[in-house]
Each structure stands twice: as C-alpha cells, then as structure tokens.
Amino acid sequence: SSLVSSVCAGELKKEGRQLKTFSFDFTDNENYFQSNSFQPSMDKPYAAKMASYLNSHHTYLECTNQTQADYLLRSVKAHDLPCMADIDSSLLYFCEQVSHTHKVVLTGECADEVFGGYPWFHRESMLDCGTFPWTPTLAPRKSLLNADFANTLRMEDYVKNAYDRAVSEVDILPMENETETSRRRIGYLSIRFFMQTLLNRMDRTSMNTGLEARVPFADKQLVSYVFNIPWEMKAKGGLVKNILRQSAVGLLPD
C-alpha cells in the first residue's frame, strides 16, 4: 500500500532511517498484461513513482511461470487444502524472497474490502445479484467434478443457504434506501467472507516462509468505523475509495 508506505517512511525519517519497500511482478508482464476490473493498470510504474517520492530502498521482485508451477505443491501444503493456484504459489515465492532479509512486513491487504474498491460495490448488476458477487456462477467449479457426484453435493443449495444466512445477519438502518442497503450487505459479505479468505491466505503463506505479514487496514476499530460511513462519503463523486484517497492528500504524489 502506498499510504501505509508513506506513513512508515515519515516515521522512520524522524529517526534518520530509510524505509525498505518491495513490489512484485511477473516476468514479461509488460508484454502480456491485460486490463481488468480488479487491476485496470500495471502496478510497476506506480511503484517506481512511489519509491522515488518516498526515497525508499526499493526492491523489485519478479516471478517466472516456471517458478509459479514449482511452488504449487508447497502452496497447497501451506493451506492444508486446494487454494488459488498460481496466485498463491507466486505469493509464497515472493514471501520467501522477502523473508531472506526481513521477518516482519506491513501490507496493504484489505483496503478494497473495507473501503469498497471492488467492482461489486459499484455495478448495480452485481449489487443485487442475489448471491456472493465474486462467484456469480458455480459452473467453473462444477466442471471439475463428475456430473453425478456434483449433483449429489447440491452445491447451489449450499451456497444459497450460506448467502441467505449471511445477509440475515446484517443490521439494516431504517433511513437507508434500497441501494444503500444493498451496499451495506455487499460490504458485510466482503468483510465476512472475501476478506477472511485473503487474510487466511496471507497468514498461511507468509508464516510458511517465516515471514510475519501485518495488515493495518484490517484493524478492528478501523473496519468497524468505516463500515458505517455513508457510501456518498466513501465514494464521493463516484471516485473509488475516495475517502481513503482524501486521507492520503499530502502523503502521496499527485
């Protein structure tokens, strides 16, 4: 996270110390990168700009396709169950590289869940999809299983029951309109399920390499406070994570 890095750099500067930062990429990513809803642009140019702005001791790490494959089995063992394949194996590799010189790091994980950065917070079709927005269909998962076996699992019923039970836990405010209520539910689902998955992934992966990854944006008090901030403040002017951006004025380059 650029904001986390900036705050840390400022504190270390008071002590005459230089912040050490890392960024990660995939080999030849500049040749094959395709913009998407989760990552509209490449990170590397912004990481370089931020490192220069903070005058941090910055290290670029790259992961090849072969390395991703080599770390797959170890990644599964770190999770004790099948996981997110190449995404997790590359994270394991990067954590291992960082662990050679550091034992504790701060990450920017969870900012999108807490401050509403994902597409499902902004697209009406995803707000009211009636299921977990990051998994609108089970077809890709069911395709991995024998059809008869998949049918006995009744996966759709399981997901629907889990979704209905989760949204019933959300406290609805009487002054909110239908759209605001939908965003409140989406926010709860993102924190209750999506964020928990990422936190577990980060914890298991980093600790497997002897690295402790701390997540400032997952601070309980911060999450509780931001959850109840009105959406028109969180995304003022339609700008994604606007309130977080405003809090960073003067701390980040324009």
Predicted ranges, named:
Residues 1-175, 182-186, 201-251:
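ATP-dependent adenylate-handling active sites, centered on carboxylate activation for C-N bond formation
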